[in-house]
A protein has these predicted regions:
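A compositional/biophysical signature of low hydrophobicity enriched in polar/charged and small residues
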Residues: 1-377
Length: 377
């Protein structure tokens, strides 16, 4: 057995790449033995899989390992674009990342030229528990940070969601699925107290020493329920569509300990298609393998009424734009009218899982001197 210090941690190491090609986004839903399943699909011995994931997590190549949730079905969520005076931008970024547990991805974006919406530099994902108002939450954040304006854009439908940076490396522009992208609804699911108990233990990030085949028995103890009941509740939640995937998330923004970067460019693509054809367009755009996210969101007049948004990453800007051109050409070839399109490039960026527990929200409001009841819809 190799020691922790000489276990390779580079995402480009052949065995690590084999593991990551599966572990980033191929373990869908809840499985009883996620590391065994990664081993089965990757063809790498389970002990080696766990040793490598532990080493990459300790070394910072992997920034977190966790069971994700389909939070769009559990909480009120949106992509929010914020307009700030330039001198307040970095301070607002720090606040959203460090002091708002309900903001997830926080990124400063820019466009190659002055375009509609290019003055909205700060983009965040925000989620609040069911029953609370995302507009009120954002208005409160705007007050705390001195924002001039903000635009809340909830996802109406989801067409693609799966990161897989290693799997996408070297992908040719135009690579797409034969079939249309599946449409995921964002209807809300209500949970019992027991289900929240299980879900809270289920979704917590793994420490390196928790990377083991009996992962869920420890989480069942944490939730205060017998293992079999924990597994049954988790599988029921999975059937109800509220469990996402078991995933290793790479550090894809900052340079790694090895000096490499997983990706350099993060692009948010916008398209405006005719009202009434959003699902048709989303199912076409969502076919493209390069996209890590694709949604129907309403950009409103601030963004020239764009309604399809997608995210792609890459190590070269020209290659990211080549992928965008391939999507544009495909939309033109099928006769899908696009009245406007744009690219917002990501700069400074931080990501953390958003808190979605109603109990945590009530505590946060109280800590800020706000009556939680006043934040309800």
């Amino acid at each position: 057995m190799t020691t922790a210090t000489d276990t390779p941690i580079a995402h480009t190491d052949p065995i690590n790449a084999q593991i990551l090609a599966i572990s980033e986004d191929r373990i869908q839903g809840f499985v009883r033995d996620p590391f065994g399943e990664i081993a089965r699909q990757s063809g790498v011995d389970p002990e080696v899989v766990m040793e490598r994931i532990r080493a990459m997590l300790r070394g910072g190549t992997i920034r977190r390992v966790r069971q994700t949730l389909m939070a769009t079905n559990l909480a009120e969520g949106a992509l929010v674009a914020w307009q700030f005076p330039n001198e307040k931008l970095d301070e607002a970024f720090d606040f959203m990342f460090q002091q708002d547990p309900f903001s997830g991805h926080v990124v400063i974006r820019s466009t190659d030229a002055a375009t509609p919406g290019s003055s909205y530099r700060l983009w965040t994902t925000v989620k609040v528990p069911q029953g609370y108002s995302i507009e009120k939450h954002c208005a409160f954040l705007a007050q705390l940070t001195g924002a001039d304006h903000f635009r809340v854009m909830p996802a109406k439908r989801i067409f693609a969601l799966g990161v897989g940076h290693v799997r996408r490396k070297g992908m040719e522009p135009g690579s797409k699925s034969e079939e249309l992208a599946q449409v995921k609804d964002t209807a809300k699911v209500e949970l019992s107290d027991l289900e929240w108990q299980v879900l809270t233990a289920l979704k917590r990030e793994l420490e390196p020493e928790e990377v083991s085949r009996d992962l869920w028995s420890k989480r069942a103890s944490e939730a205060g329920v017998p293992l079999e009941q924990f597994l049954e509740v988790a599988e029921n939640l999975n059937r109800r569509g509220v469990v996402g995937r078991f995933s290793t998330f790479l550090e894809h923004v900052k340079p790694l300990q090895t000096g490499e970067r997983v990706t350099r460019f993060n692009a948010l693509f916008h398209w405006a298609v005719p009202p009434g054809r959003e699902i048709e367009a989303g199912q076409q755009v969502g076919r493209f393998h390069i996209l890590t996210h694709c949604y129907w969101r309403e950009g409103g007049p601030e963004f020239r009424n764009v309604n399809i948004m997608a995210v792609a990453h890459g190590t070269e800007k020209e290659m990211v734009l080549a992928h965008k051109r391939a999507i544009d050409e495909h939309l033109a070839s099928i006769g899908m009218p696009v009245s406007y399109t744009n690219v917002f490039w990501g700069g400074r960026s931080e990501i953390k899982p958003s808190e979605i527990s109603p109990f945590a929200y009530q505590e946060w409001c109280a800590s800020r001197g706000v009556d939680p009841q006043s934040m309800r819809e």
